[in-house]
Amino acid sequence: MFSLTSAMQYYLYSHPTDMRRSFYTLSGMITNLMGRNVQDGDVYIFINRPRTSMKILHMECGGLVIYHMKLESGCFKLPVFDQSTNTFQTSWQDLMMMVQGVMSDEKVKKKRRKKLRNSR
């Protein structure tokens, strides 16, 4: 069950991530590279280099949970990068738009519209 809410803090890892990584490696990246504690209940987002795949890691009461989304076509558009804090400004709304495909490059939207028109 998708149990993420707007009350949680969201952190997008600022470098491309190998999507073969799983619970332990991603947890290590959060601790060692992001300086955060995975058990705080915050949500951590990882995206691969071509921006076609996303993993979301967070801690629930029963343990760690990973959500993995892979786009059939197009790519995720990253939120605005904040140079003062060296992080991406990420919120619940940004994540939902990314997952639902609303926050995507204009070229991708055109490709999707063209595919829809051709399939009719």
Tell me the role of every PLM-derived stretch.
Residues M1-R120:
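Polybasic/polar functional segments that serve as interface/processing modules
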